[in-house]
């Protein structure tokens, strides 16, 4: 599946790993696949791992990604980057996102809907595999003032994210992962 574009590549790459060879799986948005290095986890802790993060990964995509992971792997540890928990999915956009997440898992054609463009353009994607990790070399400091201040305010998790988070917890418990 070297034609699979960046957003979906970890969905397939994890299935190509030797069965039951991954101790830990990382899920979440771009912060997950640019921040946690499986090579570093191996070097420092002797732990095999794979990053199954996606750009803008939602909680329902995380759930279906984990269902995919558990087809061939039995990781004892799931590391979840939680930015997506607080992403609001409301109105028609929320409905489209929910249906898209379900469709992407069950219908391969939907997941690969843009591969034909790459084939016609003669574009090929590299086969470099860093266990789902992506190097990010364009880091720039934020200079527009304070954006995180400590307060007593509690941010509630949107209901759709909470629904899928509960499903993720049940799935992980069922499969013996923490």
Residue ranges and their predicted role:
Residues 1-23:
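N-terminal secretory targeting modules
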Residues 1-6, 35, 133-139:
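Short, compositionally biased "basic patch" segments
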Residues 2-5, 27-28, 54-58, 155-158:
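Short, flexible loop segments at the rims of nucleotide/cofactor-binding pockets, characterized by
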Residues 9-12, 64-67, 163-168:
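Alpha-helical scaffolding within the catalytic cores
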Residues 21-22, 47-48, 74-77, 173-177:
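Loop/turn elements at helix/coil->beta-strand transitions in domains of secreted/extracellular proteins
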Residues 24-25, 44-51, 144-152:
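Acidic/histidine-rich, surface-exposed loop or edge segments in extracytoplasmic proteins
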Residues 27, 31-111:
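Membrane-embedded segments
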Residues 91-177:
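Secreted/periplasmic serine-hydrolase-like ester/acetyl group-modifying domain
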């Amino acid at each position: 599946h070297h034609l699979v574009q960046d957003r979906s590549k970890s969905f397939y790459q994890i299935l190509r790993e030797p069965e039951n060879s991954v101790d830990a799986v990382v899920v979440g948005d771009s912060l997950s696949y640019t921040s946690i290095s499986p090579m570093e986890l191996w070097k420092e802790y002797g732990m095999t791992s794979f990053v199954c993060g996606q750009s803008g990964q939602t909680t329902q995509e995380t759930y279906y990604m984990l269902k995919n992971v558990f087809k061939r792997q039995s990781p004892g540890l799931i590391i979840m980057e939680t930015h997506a928990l607080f992403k609001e999915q409301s109105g028609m956009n929320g409905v489209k996102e929910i249906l898209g997440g379900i469709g992407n898992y069950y219908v391969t054609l939907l997941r690969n809907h843009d591969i034909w463009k790459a084939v016609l353009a003669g574009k090929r994607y590299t086969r470099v595999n860093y266990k789902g990790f992506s190097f990010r070399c364009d880091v720039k400091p934020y200079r527009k003032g304070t954006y995180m201040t400590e307060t007593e305010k509690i941010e509630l998790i949107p209901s759709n994210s909470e629904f899928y988070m509960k499903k993720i917890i049940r799935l992980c418990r069922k499969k013996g992962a923490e």
